[in-house]
Curated annotation (Swiss-Prot):
Interacts with host SGS3. This is Protein V2. Its main location: host cell. Through its interaction with host SGS3, acts as a suppressor of RNA-mediated gene silencing, also known as post-transcriptional gene silencing (PTGS), a mechanism of plant viral defense that limits the accumulation of viral RNAs. The keyword Signal does not apply. It is found in: Host cytoplasm, Host perinuclear region.
């Protein structure tokens, strides 16, 4: 965890609040499995807090809120079955058989060269 006595403080109170909120959300994120809707929503909320300008933060929050309102509490811990294209999603790094998702399985072929 972040130690306030060993690290620099942000320049503003707002920066400190954002930093503490992100640290808290990272701890909450660890309670969700990586392939669940709850994990995706926590990552989206962290990206809302990290947005640099108001318009971008507002756009991200609107998208986050629509996803949150459209899901029930029971869906938050359920695996997500729909494909997504977010860059932080751990589902894109591995599949069921510990193969990377973008790597196709190679097939053995017989030697077809003429002797």
């Amino acid at each position: 965890m972040w130690d306030p006595l060993l690290n620099e403080f942000p320049d503003s109170v707002h920066g400190l609040r954002c930093m503490l909120a992100i640290k808290y959300l990272q701890l909450v994120e660890e309670t969700y499995e990586p392939n669940t809707l709850g994990h995706d929503l926590i990552r989206d909320l962290i990206s809302v807090i990290r947005a640099r300008d108001y318009a971008e933060a507002n756009r991200r929050y609107t998208n986050f809120n629509a996803r949150l309102e459209g899901s029930s509490k029971t869906e938050l811990r359920q695996p997500v079955y729909q494909p997504c294209c977010c860059p932080h999603c751990p589902r894109h790094q591995a599949s069921i058989m510990d193969l990377q998702a973008h790597v196709s399985k190679a097939a053995d072929v017989q030697n077809v060269q003429k002797p």
